[in-house]
Design a protein with these regions (language model features):
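Catalytic core of nucleotide-sugar-dependent glycosyltransferases
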Residues: 198, 215, 222, 235-267, ...
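Glycine-rich, basic loop-to-helix element that forms the pyrophosphate-binding segment
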Residues: 73-89
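Conserved donor NDP-sugar-binding/catalytic core segment of glycosyltransferases
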Residues: 106-140
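Short, flexible, basic/aromatic active-site loop/helix in glycosyltransferases
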Residues: 143-163
Length: 329
């Protein structure tokens, strides 16, 4: 049985230059003696000295050497790296700390207490500020900072299940839930992120799967971290890669809409379901006859959810529905 405590998962791809400051902040965590914790570096097919730097940096601080573990994941991709980290975790809670996230010294202890106090929290997020190695941020950065996992994730604290998802940066979750959410039977339906590919909707997909399982998303500003953003992030090369990633982003957005629709249906009042079944089927027939602009794909999904009658829904929709039926608490 997995032990009580927190495993901090740091997924790395060529992170040698970014790791020292990140590990410094992890080594400086103020964690009470009754809370067990560890740091797991997942070297995700790096071609630099990521693993060596991690080991050497950790030795600089007054922390037991066994508190840091380095594991390798040869399959490139953030989802593979996170899965490897979760599989290796010794403790029941996970913190996904990006290689450029500098966690506040109370992050681990606060995260543990919040998760322990509410068993229905599936994922927990915090607030970040940004720093850079450039002289200053570009003029446009403040208006776009949320896309860089910077700032507040919500105008209100507490349950944000129906208002927003959570960033993967600094996200806290339960090890069991992460392993249950993504596995061989139910892998991600998204294209995913590999190496230098920038587009990724895995964080949002994970949040949707938690909601389908009956868990909640929480936001708490006692969890704070600094997000280091290199000036390379606004270089022409990086911007070009961002533009190229938009094709993947469009696909991901279409697939995530299926999760969004199913979650809405799950929380629809039972008294409205018969009405929606009839309305949806009539809308479907009208669509076939070319008499309405009713969303053809959406009508099939809604009818499938309520009646289990397949009018031609795609495989991903069926997989999402199967995941919901098997894992709903």
């Amino acid at each position: 049985m997995i032990s009580s405590g927190i495993s901090v998962i740091v997924c790395c791809y060529n992170s040698a230059a970014r790791l020292p400051e990140t590990l410094k902040h992890l080594a400086m965590q103020l964690v009470p003696g009754n809370i067990s914790w560890e740091v797991i570096i997942v070297d995700n097919a790096s071609t630099d000295s990521t693993s060596e730097i991690a080991e050497n940096e950790w030795q600089k601080y007054d922390q037991p050497s066994e508190k840091l573990r380095i594991v390798n994941e040869k399959e490139p991709g953030l989802s593979y790296a996170r899965q490897k980290g979760a599989q290796e975790a010794s403790y029941k809670y996970l913190i996904f700390c990006d290689d450029d996230n500098w966690l506040n010294s109370s992050y681990i202890s606060n995260a543990f207490i919040i998760m322990e106090n509410d068993p229905k929290i599936g994922a927990l997020g915090g607030k970040s500020t940004a720093t850079t190695d450039d002289n200053q941020f570009p003029e446009w950065f403040e208006s776009k900072q949320n896309g860089f996992a910077v700032g507040s994730q919500s105008p209100v604290q507490g349950d944000v299940s129906q208002t927003c998802g959570l960033w993967g940066a600094g996200m806290v979750t339960r090890t069991e839930l992460y392993l249950k959410s993504f596995n061989k039977m139910y892998p991600s339906i998204l294209v995913g992120r590999k190496g230098e590919i920038l587009s990724s909707g895995e964080d949002t997909e994970f949040c949707y799967r938690l909601l389908l399982m009956g868990y909640r998303l929480f936001y708490d500003e006692t969890l704070t971290f600094v997000h280091f953003i290199s000036k390379e992030r606004w270089s022409p090369d990086y911007i070009e890669r961002s533009i190229k990633s938009c094709e993947t982003g469009v696909f991901d957005s279409m697939e995530l809409n299926k999760y969004s629709l199913l979650n809405k249906l799950v929380y629809t009042k039972k008294t409205l379901k018969p009405i929606l079944i009839v309305k949806t089927f009539l809308g479907y027939l009208s669509t076939l006859a070319g008499r309405t602009s009713w969303s053809f794909a959406e009508s099939k999904i809604i009818f499938y959810y309520y009646s289990q009658i397949d009018l031609g829904v795609d495989k991903n929709t069926k997989d999402i529905f199967s995941f919901y039926k098997e894992n709903r608490q």
